[in-house]
Structure formats: structure tokens, C-alpha cells
Design a protein with these regions (language model features):
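Conserved AMP-binding/adenylate-forming core of the ANL superfamily
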Residues: 47-102, 119-124
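Short, small-residue-rich loop/turn micro-motifs
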Residues: 41, 50-52, 115
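N-terminal presequences and immediately downstream first alpha-helices
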Residues: 1-24, 133-137, 150
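Structural core segment of the AMP-binding/adenylate-forming
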Residues: 102-151
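Short, solvent-exposed loop/helix junctions and linker helices
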Residues: 27-31, 59, 117
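Short, flexible, glycine/charge-rich loop motifs used to bind or transfer phosphoryl groups or to couple energy/partner
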Residues: 36-39, 76-78, 125, 144-148
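A short N-terminal helical cap/helix-turn-helix that marks the beginning
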Residues: 2-9, 26-48
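Residue-level preference for short coil/turn positions at secondary-structure junctions
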Residues: 42-44, 83, 131
Length: 151
């Protein structure tokens, strides 16, 4: 986008421009997962291309992401997670992280990123400040939560 194009977009921007593109509405609300995943889940359209360092590259369709994130959202609901609850993920950048993010949004919860480079103190501070209800992690990062009394 050129500077001229950007300036024109900026000068003419209104919320109505965005709302025209949404399944839901800004006033009534919308589900972010439906907007960024479900609406594209027709056929074999690729929604995520993963280029791994420690594991093989892979591609994942929107339909696959929709199905997996729906299962994860159901899991969250079974754990008592609902609208507005904070769900953190302490995971590497993998397709599974995207499923956690989408499933959290699908459940109406708030996704809270925790970067794997954070130490235990930084993680504990963020979890406490946000009043996080659930942390999703893997075996590699689990020890970073050992001293957190809420985990």
C-alpha cells in the first residue's frame, strides 16, 4: 500500500467500512473465531502453513482448524470456562497454539499469550494480574508454573 493509498484509506475510514465485512455487528457483537476462521472453512482452503524447526512443515485447512477449535472450545466449556474468562497458553508457536487461540475465542473467553521465553516470575505476575482461570501448556514448559500457587 502506497502512502497515498494509506492516506486515502485513513481519511475515509469509518466503523461502517469494517462492519460491512463482518458476519456479526459492532453493536450486537460478533465471535472473532467465526470471523477469522469459520467463514473461510469451505473445501480445502489452507488457513495455516507451519514451517517448523524441530518438526516437519505442515498445512492446515480452515475446516480442520474450525473442527479442532470447536473441540477445544467444548473442552473449555466442560472446565467451566465461559464468556470473558481469561485462558492463557504457554506453548511454542505451533499449530496446536493456533487451535488453543481459536478455541478460546470460540468459547467467548479472552486469550492471554504467555511467551515461552518468560521466566516463572513474569508468568506468575501476568497470571495473577489478569486473574487467569486456566493455563494450557506442554511438558516442556510445565515446570515454569511449579511455583505459582494458583496452578
Amino acid at each position: 500500500m502506497s502512502n497515498t493509498d494509506y492516506q486515502s484509506f485513513y481519511d475515509n475510514f469509518t466503523p461502517a467500512v469494517i462492519e460491512e465485512q463482518l458476519i456479526g455487528s459492532l453493536k450486537e457483537g460478533f465471535n472473532v473465531c467465526e470471523e477469522i476462521c469459520d467463514r473461510w472453512a469451505d473445501g480445502d482452503r489452507v488457513g495455516l502453513s507451519y514451517e517448523g524447526i524441530t518438526r516437519p512443515a505442515s498445512q492446515h485447512t480452515y475446516a480442520e482448524l474450525k473442527e479442532k477449535s470447536a473441540r477445544f472450545a467444548n473442552f473449555l466449556n466442560s472446565q467451566g470456562i465461559g464468556k470473558g474468562d481469561r485462558v492463557a497458553a504457554l506453548l511454542p508457536r505451533t499449530p496446536e497454539l493456533m487451535v488453543v487461540i481459536l478455541g478460546t475465542l470460540r468459547a467467548g473467553a479472552v486469550y492471554q499469550p504467555l511467551f515461552t521465553a518468560f521466566g516463572p516470575g513474569a508468568i506468575e505476575y501476568r497470571l495473577g494480574t489478569a486473574k487467569t482461570k486456566l493455563v494450557i501448556t506442554d511438558a516442556v514448559n510445565r515446570s515454569k508454573l511449579d511455583n505459582d500457587q494458583g496452578c
